């Protein structure tokens, strides 16, 4: 088990204060020292793997610690209950990260988080392509504009449904001369939120590389078409099955995925640390 953890207060989102404090207080309560701006600790905790804005410098921290084989604890805004739950993982926030979410499950956890599965009875005909920020570790090596173009082509080989492109709200796409039947929908910020945007899952399917919309689509009952590194991949469908009924059993998956995110009170209590400690 690690003895100390580095943290970097100036490299966090402006709304991170209570969440980061809860994590640091929990570590200290377990006898783990927290060291500000240290590059020599046993591990590091960083806010997000989006190398952009205030968090740009986290990339240097991440690469420095990983190059030494040291774990990096990542805090990320949650996909289950955005603004109320927070994702905690080790080394990545895709399926390549460690969450400790596959075993020793609390089967009542989805209910505790007020999360339940929906089944679509009627949906709009369109397919949404939910694009990610190109500066995120999640899509390292992936050109998002090229990915969108290739996704459109693959969709057209499997369906004639209208396609709606949803860009990441803080990342511009270079998309010109879109084919007919393809439109762009600009995200709209929700009032009285820090950084939440409108997103509706009353569509036929959602194509997403490996971020929150894939998870949210699966919960909402909209077919998620995702990369193998997505946490939604176990309940995803392939492009070739886009016109088939979405009847995948999602019960186990929902319980498992609900063990990847925590409320502020749970961060203080240390449920997350109990889960990830084998990776530290």
What label would you give each PLM region?
Residues 85-124, 234-280:
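Leloir-type glycosyltransferase catalytic cores
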Residues 192-239:
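A donor-sugar binding/catalytic signature common to diverse glycosyltransferases
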